[in-house]
């Protein structure tokens, strides 16, 4: 199963370390049956968000901590070059990078907490779900997996 995690899910996993986002992040990095599909743009956005002063101070991170964790994530995921330029999310066009990353990486699922992306529900055969829904799918043994051709 190939998953693309939205930046908000990754931020939640980094900060909370508990809950659906953190559990999903851990599974995506350790389960052999799950491949995590990201792009450099998503990783840069993650690093930018986590190194904002208000985030670092509130959660006691240093720039070095963030870089180390993002680099570890980079090494344990499939980084795809994003060539697609689909424009789908009219309310927030910045969200299109997640759809394009998932499409170019042939992901089966996009996992997001973003209301604009969740409204899409399905994109080019890729289901858009929230972290709880994804954990439910995984716990059911991937029975909801729909492969794209």
Language model features with spans:
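Short, well-structured N-terminal submotif of metal-dependent ribonuclease cores
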Residues: 1-38
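Residues that scaffold the ATP/ADP-binding catalytic core of kinase and kinase-like folds
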Residues: 13-14, 49, 58, 120, ...
């Amino acid at each position: 199963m190939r998953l693309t995690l939205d930046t908000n899910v990754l931020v939640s996993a980094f900060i909370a370390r508990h809950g659906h986002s953190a559990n999903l992040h851990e599974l995506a990095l350790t389960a052999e049956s799950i491949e995590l599909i990201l792009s450099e743009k998503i990783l840069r956005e993650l690093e930018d968000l986590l190194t904002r002063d208000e985030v670092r101070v509130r959660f006691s991170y240093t720039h070095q901590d963030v870089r180390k964790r993002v680099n570890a994530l980079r090494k344990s995921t499939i980084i795809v070059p994003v060539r697609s330029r689909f424009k789908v999310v009219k309310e927030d066009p910045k969200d299109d990078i997640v759809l394009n990353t998932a499409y170019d990486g042939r992901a089966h699922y996009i996992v997001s907490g973003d209301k604009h992306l969740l409204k899409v529900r399905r994109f080019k055969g890729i289901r858009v779900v929230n972290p709880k829904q994804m954990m439910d799918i995984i716990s059911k043994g991937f029975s909801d997996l729909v492969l794209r051709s």
